[in-house]
């Protein structure tokens, strides 16, 4: 059997302060047959110089106009030569055995493997946390019930699967484009699970999911539901997905002490009563009461 080539697509935008660490984490892999495809989505800082400081023939750098990360990931996919493709944001890192574990899993399931997921740690305030829900098999059902627990860095797709199932390039969907793809792709393929924690998602204030413009967040989630509706989910399944989207909006509004969070929370509960028993709803209600009775904003 030939040695498996893995393509790592790294979209980036003004991440000169982070991307060096990201690249090093890939170059430090114990498995060495990979290519790094860095797609610079119109950076105005010195990202290019940081990338060029790594003299490694496995690194390819492409700069294009700013069109958001879905377009950048799709661009990188078109350039990828690997048997399998994975994605890594330019402020996250692989542990040094990440690719070795993935390739071992590929070899063990090579006859029918199309897409699989390896879990990751969340680095929050300097501490590694396990944020992946328990009992996520089958993944397709868990994506409906538990929301998006699949960060791009843990997803490996067969080259032709990635090429034929691209990220939605609607710019206003940015931030939910990965979840929309996982739901769409799970309707076509079985998503396998390799339960080895092998990468780190680093939480920081610059991350794009830290929304301050709630109107854009609401629009994004409404677009997400519009696109997801077209994937052929049953009415009960779609109501569960909708409940997750509405509760997400409610949480972010509550964290800003915005009382309109209540209306979104009620919509979430109306779609799926079980959402009441989740940590997200508990935190939402706690922050709304804190703001009302103490004036303290949540965090």
Where are these regions (language model features)?
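Glycine-rich, basic loop-to-helix element that forms the pyrophosphate-binding segment
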Residues: 64-80
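N-proximal low-complexity "stem/linker" segments adjacent to membrane-targeting elements
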Residues: 1-25
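Short aromatic/hydrophobic "clamp" motif used to bind/position activated sugar donors
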Residues: 85
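A conserved acidic beta->alpha catalytic loop
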Residues: 25, 40-49, 66, 89
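Conserved nucleotide-sugar donor-binding catalytic segment
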Residues: 118, 134-215
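Catalytic core of nucleotide-sugar-dependent glycosyltransferases
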Residues: 142-144, 197, 201-205, 210-236, ...
